[in-house]
Amino acid sequence: MSFNTFGRVFTFTTWGESHGPALGATVDGCPPGVALDEGWIQQFLDRRRPGSSKFTTQRQEPDRVRILSGVFEGRTTGTPIQLMIENTDQRSKDYGEIAQAFRPGHADIAYHLKYGIRDYRGGGRSSARETAARVAAGGVAQAVLRDLVPGLKIAGYMVQMGDLHLDRANFDLAEIGNNPFFLPDAGAVPAWEDYLNAIRKAQDSVGAAVEVLIQGCPPGLGAPVYAKLDTDLAAAMMSINAVKGVEIGEGMAAAALTGTANADEIRMGNEGPRFLSNHAGGILGGISTGQDIVVRFAVKPTSSILTPRRTINRKGEEIELITKGRHDPCVGIRAVPIAEAMAACVVLDHLLLDRAQTGGRRGTIG
């Protein structure tokens, strides 16, 4: 299996399976001299950690990260950074029944048709467990961005879960860390809790939509025509398990707008160009404009549910299957810190790529 590496200049390669002894990431292209320790990375992993609330999988993994190389006396050396996270709470016996059967909605059948062999324990490499390594790599990216672009902030949050939608009139980023849904509306949390509790009691799951807001991104990032910033952000989000669609700015809603309504008009401000709206989501022509970058994606419902489902086994026999194990009733919740990590890696990769391509030179106005 190839294609386990992400990025061009700042890269990471993830390794490991859901029920293996460990998983991790090898980060390359990190500049030297950046302050970095395990505690810094751990704060990001703790936001994604399974078992952190009753609304996520009850698999209890501490997700303690170890830095094995690339850091000396608390600073990066410019050499590859090896990160490792041990798996401690595998229950492979829960997956014995699917050794020969294909779970509907999962990657089981696709992996079998492609490779002829698969690790059926928790989905192996196709499991969302792999994303712990991405979040660790994203922590490294966040450390570099902290030094290179001090004003940059990346915030992910849920905007939809099933029939429930975020009321943007009550939007407050300060609330994201105060509830299990990463919801920027404190008043809506009880309704979201009741809704997901009902889904859980029905032994079902539900989809979601997540938004990532990137504030303070400098203008000029993105390399047309085949390394556009929005192209890479979309690819990063689509690489996350269960993501089925990505939007930038207005996204699909732009199909219902006129050119008059959609075009972001520009005026001249005291500090340069000033946009009167942000339908483009902070990116034009594949290049950042300096406005807030807005990325939104849809997450399908968890395919692992306790409702009997029709499927087939490796012999081609038609069977009925109940998926056992510990699973998220809404994978959109833990997709939030994963998306933040992927966004950080994309922005840093483009920042370093831009410095190599342009030397930091910029056009001027006025």
From Swiss-Prot:
Question: What pathway is this protein said to act in by its record?
Answer: Metabolic intermediate biosynthesis; chorismate biosynthesis; chorismate from D-erythrose 4-phosphate and phosphoenolpyruvate: step 7/7
Q: Which PROSITE patterns match?
A: CHORISMATE_SYNTHASE_1 (PS00787), CHORISMATE_SYNTHASE_3 (PS00789)
Give the GO terms filed under biological process for this record. Answer: amino acid biosynthetic process; aromatic amino acid family biosynthetic process; chorismate biosynthetic process
The protein's GO terms of the molecular function aspect are:
chorismate synthase activity; FMN binding
EC no. given is 4.2.3.5
Write down the chemical reaction(s) this protein catalyses.
Answer: 5-O-(1-carboxyvinyl)-3-phosphoshikimate = chorismate + phosphate
UniProt-listed Gene3D superfamilies: Chorismate synthase AroC
What is one cellular component GO term in this UniProt entry?
A: cytosol
Superkingdom, according to UniProt? Bacteria
Cofactor binding note of this UniProt entry:
Reduced FMN (FMNH(2)).
The record's subunit annotation is:
Homotetramer.
Query: What family classification does the UniProt entry report for this protein?
Result: Belongs to the chorismate synthase family.
* PANTHER family reported in the protein's UniProt record: CHORISMATE SYNTHASE
Q: What does this protein do?
A: This reaction introduces a second double bond into the aromatic ring system.
Q: What is the protein name given in its UniProt record?
A: Chorismate synthase
